[in-house]
Amino acid sequence: MPTGGGKSITFQVPALAMEGICIVVTPLIALMKDQVENLRRIGIKATAIYSGMSRQEIITQLENCIFGGYKFLYVSPERLSTDIFRIKMEAMQVCLLVIDESHCISQWGYDFRPSYLNIAEIRDLLPGVPVLALTATATPEVVNDIQERLRFKEKNVFQKSFARKNLAYIVRKTEDKLNTLVYILGKVPG
């Protein structure tokens, strides 16, 4: 699915219908904070653990996920390797494991992150928990690599076209680039 194509709703709605907490692995702190803020704004208990937090803050958030009725926990792939995370995660009732930006797991991907390779180990700690991998950018080779590295038994792929009706590419030839740019910007709302 393309960026802005509704990937978050593909896991948020099912997780809300299930008992337990949904762990979302994502590499971007800004995205974590944005998602948590949006969920909290509509009354859904969500939290994120990211670099810069103290050990005590991390432990508090993890304990809140065990005992506090949280529905969503956003973490970086690097966090999955820590002992404290693994110990606390085993005490959680995890209903869904989501890997966002899953193209980062593939060495064929443009944005490979070695820490994503540890996600398969997390699957071993959460037997029977469904896993969903999401990305807006994956070639067929990367899709296959994602499925192999995450040990998917059944390979289900849902794709949406990158073509967006609300986007257009136009080439304008002009001698006066600055005035043309100012004119175009004046026509664009926002």
For every predicted segment, state its role.
Residues 90-99, 103-160, 178, 182:
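Post-DEXD/H (motif II) to motif III coupling segment of the RecA-like Helicase ATP-binding lobe
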Residues 6-16, 32, 115:
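Motif I (Walker A/P-loop) of helicase-class P-loop NTPases
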Residues 168-190:
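Conserved interdomain hinge at the start of the Helicase C-terminal
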Residues 19-42, 51-53, 57, 76-79, ...:
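Conserved Walker A/P-loop ATP-binding site and its immediately adjacent core
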Residues 1-13, 23-26:
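Walker A/P-loop
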Residues 20-23, 45, 69-73, 93-96, ...:
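Loop/turn-to-beta-strand initiation segments
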Residues 43-53, 154-160:
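Conserved RecA-like helicase motor-core motifs
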Residues 12, 53-96, 104-110:
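Conserved helix/coil segment N-terminal to the catalytic DExD/H
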